[in-house]
């Protein structure tokens, strides 16, 4: 009953929020610098969606995120709620690599396209390579990108095998990887489930992992290093003092995001 009520409120709050954000975002998304204005609005959308589902958001280790230089964020993927949680928690401008089918969704797809998110067609290797090349272009332009190295959501909570594309981008560009561990999304909304369970999502930022001086042939070692970091961050190991976003404080904090 609680999950049914939370889902009903989530839909009543989230649907009009998504429609409005999609329409407005599509218009302002093309105001230079492209996508930045839409991303600020998306943070409001993300917090509203989470609050509508009675999902509390905590963020830990935001001070570890470098400012003024591009990075590759890499996060574990547990739930559809990963997207709003990460949008709300990441304190810098960032572009996501997301599966191509999301861009076909009315309003939501329009908004993420306007934000400059990059579609990835996992079924078409050539198109997938092109998407990673586009991500590399964004990095060269000074933009950070976020990649789910598993490329799909886990069903049992275990980390899935990593794909190498994001690691090759970071190595070739010589920019650090910031591991981001999510704890709680799968409990609130697991894959193949459509009823939200009220709860808490914690987003933990790890220390940047440098890639300067490493060769492309070192990608296997780098992948294992990131995997170990994500395994630790998904639990309570090395957690920084939490920052909680709730109610009006959640909305107010958006204005201080950079």
Language model feature labels by segment:
Residues 6-13, 42-98:
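Conserved H-X4-D acyltransferase segment
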Residues 49-52, 73-74, 122-126, 155-157:
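Short, flexible loop segments at the rims of nucleotide/cofactor-binding pockets, characterized by
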Residues 129-258:
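Non-catalytic C-terminal accessory region of glycerolipid acyltransferases
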Residues 1-58, 110-114:
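A transmembrane-helix-recognition feature enriched in membrane-embedded lipid enzymes
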Residues 60, 97-99, 121-122, 149, ...:
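Thr-Gly-centered strand-to-loop micro-motif
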Residues 78-130, 134:
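Membrane-embedded segments
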């Amino acid at each position: 009953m609680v999950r049914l009520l939370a889902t009903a409120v989530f839909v009543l709050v989230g649907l009009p929020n998504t429609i409005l954000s999609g329409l407005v975002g599509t218009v302002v998304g093309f105001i230079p610098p492209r996508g930045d204005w839409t991303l600020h609005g998306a943070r409001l959308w993300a917090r509203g969606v989470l609050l509508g589902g009675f999902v509390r958001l905590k963020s830990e280790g935001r001070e570890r995120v470098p400012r003024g230089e591009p990075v590759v964020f890499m996060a574990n993927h547990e739930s559809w709620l990963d997207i709003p949680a990460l949008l709300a928690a990441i304190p810098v401008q960032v572009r996501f690599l997301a599966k191509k089918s999301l861009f076909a969704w009315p309003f939501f797809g329009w908004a993420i396209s306007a934000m400059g998110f990059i579609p990835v067609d996992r079924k078409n290797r050539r198109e997938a390579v092109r998407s990673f090349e586009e991500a590399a272009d964004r990095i060269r332009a000074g933009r950070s990108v976020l990649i789910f190295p598993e490329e799909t959501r886990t069903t049992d909570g275990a980390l899935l095998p990593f794909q190498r594309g994001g690691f090759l981008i970071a190595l070739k560009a010589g920019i650090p990887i910031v591991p981001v561990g999510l704890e709680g999304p799968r409990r609130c909304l697991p894959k193949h489930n459509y009823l939200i369970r009220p709860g808490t999502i914690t987003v933990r930022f790890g220390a940047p992992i440098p890639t300067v001086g490493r060769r492309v042939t070192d990608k296997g070692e780098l992948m294992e290093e990131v995997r170990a970091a994500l395994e630790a961050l998904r639990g309570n190991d090395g957690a920084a003092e939490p920052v909680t976003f709730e109610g009006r404080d959640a909305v107010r904090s958006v204005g201080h995001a950079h």
